[in-house]
Regions:
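Membrane-embedded alpha-helical bundles that constitute the cytochrome b-like, heme-associated redox core
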Residues: 1-190
C-alpha cells in the first residue's frame, strides 16, 4: 500500500503539467516535518524486515530454485505462477529499491526539477522503466495473495479479484509511465 501512496505522491508532478509546484509543495511538507529524513530510513528498515520475513519461504539454493520451477510447471496453476513472479520481483526490488532510496535520500531536498534532471540524464530513465512494473506486479500480486490467504478472496470470487488486481496494476503502471514522461519531457532541470 505504501508503494501505491508513493506513486500517487510522485505523480503529483502531473497536476501542473510538469511545473512541479504541487510535487515540490508535498516534498517540502515531508521534509519540513522531518518525515523524509526519518521516514525514509524507517521505510528502508521496514522493506528489509519484509524481505527477511518473506525470504523464509523463498528458495535460495540453485537446487531448490530448479525444484520450485519444475513444481510450478507441473502444477500449471495461476496462483503458483503469481508466487513465482512475486518472488523474482522481490529480489529485483530489494536491490533497485535500495539504489533508488540511497540516491534520493542522499540528495535532499526532493524537488521535481532534481527528479527530472535525474531521469533526463544517464541511465535513470531505463532504471525506472524496469523498476516500475516490478514494483506494481509485486504489490498487486501481494494484495491479491493476502486476500486469498486470509479468506477474503474465495474460489467463487477469485476470478473477479484476479481481474481487479490486473486492472489496478495496469492503472498504476500507466500512472507511472505518464509520470516518467512528464519528468523526461516537461520538467525543466535546475
Amino acid at each position: 500500500m505504501f508503494m501505491w501512496a508513493h506513486m500517487i505522491l510522485v505523480a503529483s508532478v502531473n497536476l501542473d503539467l510538469g511545473g512541479g509546484r504541487v510535487m515540490n509543495w508535498i516534498a517540502h511538507f515531508f521534509e519540513a516535518t522531518y518525515m523524509a529524513q526519518i521516514g525514509g530510513p524507517m521505510i528502508a528498515l521496514v522493506m528489509l524486515a519484509h524481505f527477511v520475513l518473506a525470504a523464509r519461504k523463498l528458495p535460495f539454493k540453485a537446487r531448490e530454485q530448479k525444484e520450485m520451477w519444475r513444481h510450478s510447471v507441473r502444477l500449471n496453476h495461476l496462483d503458483t505462477w503469481l508466487w513465482v513472479i512475486q518472488a523474482v520481483t522481490a529480489f529485483i526490488i530489494l536491490i533497485m529499491g535500495c539504489i533508488h532510496m540511497w540516491t534520493v535520500l542522499t540528495d535532499l531536498p526532493i524537488t521535481a526539477q532534481k527528479s527530472g534532471a535525474r531521469i533526463q540524464g544517464g541511465w535513470w530513465l531505463l532504471f525506472y522503466i524496469f523498476l516500475l512494473p516490478m514494483i506494481e506486479l509485486h504489490v498487486g500480486i501481494g494484495a491479491y495473495r493476502i486476500g486469498v490467504k486470509w479468506g477474503w478472496i474465495k474460489r467463487s470470487n477469485r476470478q473477479f479479484f484476479h481481474g481487479l488486481e490486473n486492472k489496478i496494476t495496469l492503472i498504476f503502471i500507466t500512472i507511472g509511465v505518464i509520470t516518467l514522461f512528464t519528468f523526461y519531457v516537461l520538467v525543466k532541470p535546475m
